[in-house]
Amino acid sequence: MSNTQTVKAVAKYIRMSPHKVRRVLNQIRGRSYQEALMILEFLPYDAGGPVWQVVHSAAANAKNNYGLDKKKLIIEEVFANEGPKLKRIRPRAQGRAYSILKPTCHITVIVKGTS
């Protein structure tokens, strides 16, 4: 029976809607580390950048903390949770003010590797 190790990396307070980030995360779920980086490199979405950084960080954690080989890593779990909303006010006509909610999210990547 092979020994598997899971490693986690989290990026918090990313100034992006979790809905838009999940669209990117669905593309890399269950793929190998190198395949995921290749996909993220060429996706036309802005969310690809922060997700690439978190995946890269998870692989670095696996290598430095547990001595795992990056080539053998598989993305086991990825998800984006909702963070706090930044509240802004936009002045409108006749003394009114509209509130603008700028969403943030927390991206979590869990990679699995065999030692």
UniProtKB/Swiss-Prot annotation:
One GO process term, biological-process aspect: translation
Membrane-spanning residues: none
GO cellular component, one term: large ribosomal subunit
Stored SUPFAM superfamilies: Ribosomal protein L22
UniProt GO molecular function: rRNA binding; structural constituent of ribosome
Keyword RNA-binding applies: yes
Coarse class of the protein's main subcellular location: plastid
InterPro entries membership: Ribosomal_uL22, Ribosomal_uL22_bac/chlpt-type, Ribosomal_uL22_bac/org-type, Ribosomal_uL22_CS, Ribosomal_uL22_sf
Any Pfam family the entry gives: Ribosomal_L22
Superkingdom of the organism of origin: Eukaryota
Recorded coiled-coil stretches: none
Keywords: Chloroplast, Plastid, Ribonucleoprotein, Ribosomal protein, RNA-binding, rRNA-binding
Function description: This protein binds specifically to 23S rRNA. The globular domain of the protein is located near the polypeptide exit tunnel on the outside of the subunit, while an extended beta-hairpin is found that lines the wall of the exit tunnel in the center of the 70S ribosome.
Recorded family membership: Belongs to the universal ribosomal protein uL22 family.
Assembly, per entry: Part of the 50S ribosomal subunit.
Protein name: Large ribosomal subunit protein uL22c
Gene for this chain: rpl22
